[in-house]
């Protein structure tokens, strides 16, 4: 029978003053030497209090990306108990937390960049990417007894998809954009998890050319005052990636979708808006605070994406001189220190009434892309940032945890009779 230490009392969001928090560092699973180097595009959630699940992801374990290393995809599913270690660190005033990880199973195949959402005590996973290409799989991950787990299939996606944004409204999972059959798409799918035997439904596509690396969240607690129903918030940034007759550009755009009316509303981000420099491509959202963070700097990433596009075209035309030039530029781009890339570390929200973004005061992490962020609505902690990239091609195994519940009197011990 497992013991869990539960934090009780008030909880705070990203607007709370940073000095009110205690911050701890931990590591993602270190049981495999390649996975131990850190991954991005992984799956993670807290399916029981104080018990993390982490699965899949990808990295360059043998040789860095800037030196032409091969990307490796992972299928391992790990669980880790962290809450007792946080309690101990609070008592000893330590800054590091030792999470006890176990390997409990494998995904149906090595997977990165899948859409996933925590749904009660389950993780819903859809699509993703493997070394062989994009995936159609959809399934439920659920923990069992004695470090066991089950994977229950859901209806397969209509076509292979990866890199989608996702969000839940009540029992319905939404998949927004991503790559469909290898090409960026603005299509949207939904699946009613209360009736999973049904097939995926097509929703209204978002009204924009396809974005790369969207970020989405549900405004469950901030319903649209005009309709009184929850809606999806979506942030997009990079377009023109696949279109042969267009250049890549950062067209940072905030969009909302109300499933009840099947309608989108688009808000163009002005160049002087504080969020225009970010775009949050590869970033993450906090549903509890309706805010965005993380991801790449817009101007630098546009140049890198255009270079990749030009390199592909030069190879197709057999222009060796241009290929050599672009490859040299690409290596130079990947050789800077992490700080140079300016991954976003602050939190921003979008005020629909003013049509502008605004910075939110309070706690911020180091900037990362393709990481997993758990807020207080999905974790016993006030915030947790897991893995991801610190610069293009470079992953980190670091987990950053912050909490306001560091007074030992705010913890109590309960038992989970179903977990041994």
Residue positions per predicted region:
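Bacterial N-terminal signal peptides
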Residues: 1-9
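Sec/Tat signal peptide C-region and signal peptidase I cleavage site
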Residues: 12-16
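Kelch-like beta-propeller repeat domains
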Residues: 17-420
